[in-house]
């Protein structure tokens, strides 16, 4: 079983310090929501992000959206060989049941995440998505993998197919992919740093390479 964690993801509700900012207020009003209940999104809240620490990397739910679409629609997931988790910058962990169908439409995805932040589970009863306050270290300790790998541009260079073989040789490997646009991980992560290419790659590209090359050896 491969455990994939999209970590330090820039997925959060609008922070209290900027809920009165016109960009947030007007956006929330258009959507008939309270400012504190909307997902922070750099596309709409660029001017408000300038007021935040690390503002240049925050408000990127699109990264999580594309990563989840790719991972949950993969053959590995359909064959029961994959578990996917999202860890956020504020140390929340989203547990995702393999049968979950993430909305392809981005606006619907945003609405789903806002409901999850508000209610802790969605949909009520089925709990396909469940959120808990938990650090990345606590999640890793809970999963108890027999190998932890951190995808990092300064990691040990390894060809994707070679890395897939390494993962396939373990019972319960865990791979961490950054859910942020640039910069480094905020969390301290134990594990071996791995780089699959000579230049930086987008998170969803890394997710694809990991899963496809893992599938090559296990399916």
Swiss-Prot record:
One of the Pfam families matching this protein, by short name: EMG1
Residue(s) at site: Interaction with substrate rRNA: 60, 101, 104, 108
EC number: 2.1.1.-
InterPro entries: Alpha/beta_knot_MTases, Rbsml_bgen_MeTrfase_EMG1/NEP1, Ribosome_NEP1_arc, tRNA_m1G_MTases_N
Function description: Methyltransferase involved in ribosomal biogenesis. Specifically catalyzes the N1-methylation of the pseudouridine corresponding to position 914 in M.jannaschii 16S rRNA.
Family: Belongs to the class IV-like SAM-binding methyltransferase superfamily. RNA methyltransferase NEP1 family.
Gene Ontology terms, MF aspect: rRNA (pseudouridine) methyltransferase activity; rRNA binding
Enzyme class: transferase
Marked site: Stabilizes Arg-60: 62
Reaction equations catalysed: a pseudouridine in rRNA + S-adenosyl-L-methionine = an N(1)-methylpseudouridine in rRNA + S-adenosyl-L-homocysteine + H(+)
GO biological process: rRNA base methylation
Keyword DNA-binding in annotation: no
Upper taxonomic lineage: Archaea, Methanobacteriati, Methanobacteriota, Thermococci, Thermococcales
Residues the record lists as binding S-adenosyl-L-methionine: 178, 183, 196-201
Protein's UniProt name: Ribosomal RNA small subunit methyltransferase Nep1
Cysteine pairings via disulfide bonds: none
Keywords of this entry: Methyltransferase, Ribosome biogenesis, RNA-binding, rRNA processing, rRNA-binding, S-adenosyl-L-methionine, Transferase
Gene: nep1
Keyword Methyltransferase on entry: yes
Subunit structure: Homodimer.
């Amino acid at each position: 079983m491969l455990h994939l964690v999209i970590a330090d993801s820039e997925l959060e509700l609008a922070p209290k310090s900027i809920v009165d900012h016109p960009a947030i207020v007007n956006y929330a009003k258009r959507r008939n929501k309270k400012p504190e209940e909307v997902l922070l999104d750099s596309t709409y809240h660029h001017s408000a992000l300038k007021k935040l620490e690390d503002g240049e990397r925050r408000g990127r739910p699109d990264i999580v959206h594309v990563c989840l679409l790719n991972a949950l629609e993969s053959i590995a997931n359909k064959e029961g060989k994959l578990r996917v988790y999202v860890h956020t910058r504020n140390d929340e962990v989203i547990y995702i049941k393999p049968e979950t169908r993430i909305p392809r439409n981005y606006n619907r995805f945003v609405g789903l995440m806002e409901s999850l932040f508000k209610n802790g589970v969605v949909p009520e009863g089925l709990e396909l998505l469940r959120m808990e306050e938990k650090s990345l270290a606590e999640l890793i300790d809970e999963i108890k993998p027999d190998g932890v790998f951190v995808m990092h541009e300064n990691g040990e260079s390894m060809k994707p197919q070679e890395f897939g073989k390494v993962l396939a040789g373990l019972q319960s490997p865990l791979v961490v992919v950054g859910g942020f646009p640039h910069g480094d991980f905020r969390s301290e992560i134990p594990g071996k740093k791995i780089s699959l290419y000579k230049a930086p790659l987008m998170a969803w590209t890394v997710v694809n390479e990991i899963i496809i090359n893992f599938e090559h050896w296990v399916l």
